[in-house]
Amino acid sequence: MDLHVGKSRGLRGTVAVPGDKSISHRAVMLGALASGETIIENFLPGEDCLSTIDCFRKLGVEINGPDNNTVRVRGRGLDGLSEPVDVLDTGNSGTTMRLILGVLAGQPFFSVITGDSSLRRRPMGRVTGPLISMGAKIDGRQNGNLAPLAVRGGTLRPINFVSPVASAQVKSAVLLAGLFTDGVTAVTEAYRTRDHTERMLRAFGAGVEVSEGTVAVKGRPRLTGRKVKVPGDISSAAFLLVAASLIPGSDLTLTGVGVNPTRIGIIEVLSSMGAEIRLFNLREEEEPVADIRVRYNGRLCGTAVGGEIIPRLIDEVPALAVAAALAEGKTVIRDAAELKVKESDRIAAVAGMLAKFGADVEELPDGLLVRGSRALKGCVCESHGDHRIAMAAAVAGLLAEGKTIVRGAECISVSFPGFSDLLAKVMVDWQ
């Protein structure tokens, strides 16, 4: 599918972005492992989260929905999953594959898990390694680094794991496996990553301790089903925040967005570049939530981004790079080599996409160098099958002279179904 975009005269109005993808995944998983019913409201009905539902149905869990973005999960308890009669297909979802591996590691049965061609190229050894050290038997291509993966779960032992990468998916997989041990499993990270798993484990009844970069979970808890209200996804909101910060005449409010401190790096960086972004109506639900107002405030300034903030905005780098292309001066993004093993090589994909628009951009081994302030020109660009590249290109198209066509834009439905309709709703008009 092609997405056609023209230069915008402003984004105005009040809208809600879809439910958070990370939280939607985790709510289904913990609901399946809990006793009783879990009701998930504002669930993200994107392809990735639907893959998680499909996998747990194959593991014997009764799941109804999504119906009006509500999902009901009838939990089976920690020991209630069934051996799947078919391969578990996680589609394009790295979150589904990595987190469900932690669950499968503790099951007394055999399973095989795979994904689409993109996911089968992404590294899984960072997860299978610690799970094997806990006692799981996992095999696959490149000694268990690439899917398809065959898992023979069973009795696991707790470990103290020091993660070599700043990855919430790795942390979460090990913590989920820790639920099936007799003891305490701990994960230590160099940089803090998103903490949705820890928060949700606590909410469902697990014993979780957090201290100085280490998260520990006590095994064999009794998890109890509950209601989960999923906030709007800050990663989806990021594209609208960038667009409204850059397009003169914009005044946009996004309601009910999750503002977990481990996820709002994009707001911090855009604000430091000069964007006018205000959080209001702050409230604490399952997660911190706020309404966000962003208004055009003149040209942004370049900046340097790296270190501990990178895990807090890793998914937003494509959107941030578009802001950098229109900012005054130079923006350097470092310590983001993890982008090379996302749905695409996002460093190369972002650099190539921005270059097509005429931006001055250079790939770095672990990030990007963007020399801003050049006017962008509409172009035809590829999504590379990556939802975040497609949306970043669409935002660039809103700022470029002439027409822009984003090829392969159907991938946007992975995380932001209805993206183009929402854009049309808040667009003042097209040039």
Swiss-Prot record:
It catalyses: 3-phosphoshikimate + phosphoenolpyruvate = 5-O-(1-carboxyvinyl)-3-phosphoshikimate + phosphate. Keywords: Amino-acid biosynthesis, Aromatic amino acid biosynthesis, Cytoplasm, Transferase. Pathway: Metabolic intermediate biosynthesis; chorismate biosynthesis; chorismate from D-erythrose 4-phosphate and phosphoenolpyruvate: step 6/7. GO terms for biological process: amino acid biosynthetic process; aromatic amino acid family biosynthetic process; chorismate biosynthetic process. Its main location: cytoplasm. The keyword Amino-acid biosynthesis applies. One of its GO terms (cellular component) is cytoplasm. Phosphoenolpyruvate binds at K21, G94, R122, Q169, R346, R388. PROSITE patterns: EPSP_SYNTHASE_1, EPSP_SYNTHASE_2. It holds the Pfam family EPSP_synthase. InterPro entries: Enolpyruvate_Tfrase_dom (IPR001986), Enolpyruvate_Tfrase_sf (IPR036968), EPSP_synthase (IPR006264), EPSP_synthase_CS (IPR023193), RNA3'P_cycl/enolpyr_Trfase_a/b (IPR013792). 3-phosphoshikimate binds at K21, S22, R26, S167, Q169, D315, K342. The keyword Protease does not apply. It is found in: Cytoplasm. SUPFAM superfamilies: EPT/RTPC-like (SSF55205). The active site is at D315. GO terms for molecular function: 3-phosphoshikimate 1-carboxyvinyltransferase activity. Its EC number is 2.5.1.19. Monomer. Belongs to the EPSP synthase family. Catalyzes the transfer of the enolpyruvyl moiety of phosphoenolpyruvate (PEP) to the 5-hydroxyl of shikimate-3-phosphate (S3P) to produce enolpyruvyl shikimate-3-phosphate and inorganic phosphate. This is 3-phosphoshikimate 1-carboxyvinyltransferase.
